[in-house]
């Protein structure tokens, strides 16, 4: 296991890799407008970074039925001084379709004037570059036959694919934490095909979608942590664990632990 979860207790794993370039280059005087779901790892990580740099953050959360007290993820963001707005799923989809650019009405409603957009999951050029560093850290040491990781927006997988050489002997296994993530699957599949890299995309069909778990998965997660003393989160890495426990892979297998917030799950 490559333990990127140890990078930072809050800006954990792939989150630091996605965010560091943005915060190096952004205008610290402008509000950051960013987006995520109720159990987004991105929002707490961005909250920590925004507070650290003394910046104002406005977070648009998918799910109009939610509030700042709905779960520890959202409560943490509010406690860091972030301004949270909750929108319907249809409004959120429309924002995604507009590349996260708000309408004039939305800007007025959320009271954002001078702002810069940080896309959902931290996706973008900075994130691709940051996540590409993962490959250079893994390959010289382990030369894996299989590299297995979780995906939400697939930003980490895309960054790794960009960094991998064409015709690589390493097979990439991407375990989606999201049900029916067809756009993300298509982006990863097309990039892998263009570089002649073997990619397996595992859709989230076993548990009902993002944030959904059952007792079998939770038991596997608990048992793994008891045996290894390695905490893993339920939304992403527990589903990688489930995949690895049900598939037989020959050769060196590296599990990329992309971090998460198992601490929040106990609150």
Predicted regions and their residues:
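Phosphate-binding loop/pocket of nucleotide- and phosphate-handling active sites
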Residues: 248-267
């Amino acid at each position: 296991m490559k333990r990127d979860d140890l990078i930072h207790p809050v800006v954990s794993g792939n989150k630091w890799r996605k965010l560091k370039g943005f915060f190096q280059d952004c205008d610290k005087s402008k509000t950051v407008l960013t987006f995520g779901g109720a159990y987004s790892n991105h929002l707490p990580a961005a909250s920590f970074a925004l507070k650290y740099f003394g910046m104002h953050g406005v977070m648009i959360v998918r799910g109009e039925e939610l509030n700042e007290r709905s779960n520890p993820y959202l409560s943490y963001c509010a406690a860091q001084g972030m301004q949270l707005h909750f929108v319907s799923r249809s409004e959120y989809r429309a924002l995604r379709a507009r590349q996260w650019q708000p309408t004039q009405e939305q800007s007025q409603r959320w009271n954002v004037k001078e702002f810069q957009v940080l896309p959902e999951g931290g996706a973008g050029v900075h994130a691709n570059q940051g996540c590409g560093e993962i490959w250079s850290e893994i390959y010289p040491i382990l030369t894996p036959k299989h590299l297995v990781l979780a995906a939400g927006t697939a930003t980490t997988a895309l960054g790794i694919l960009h960094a991998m050489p064409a015709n690589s002997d390493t097979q990439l296994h991407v375990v989606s934490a999201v049900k029916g993530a067809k756009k993300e699957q298509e982006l990863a599949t097309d990039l892998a095909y263009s570089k002649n890299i073997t990619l397996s995309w595992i859709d989230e069909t076993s548990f009902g979608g993002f944030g959904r778990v059952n007792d079998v998965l939770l038991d596997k997660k608990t048992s793994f942590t008891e045996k290894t003393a390695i905490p893993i989160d339920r939304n992403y890495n527990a589903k990688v664990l489930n995949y690895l426990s049900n598939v037989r892979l020959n050769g060196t297998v590296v599990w990329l632990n992309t971090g998460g917030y198992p601490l929040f799950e106990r609150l």
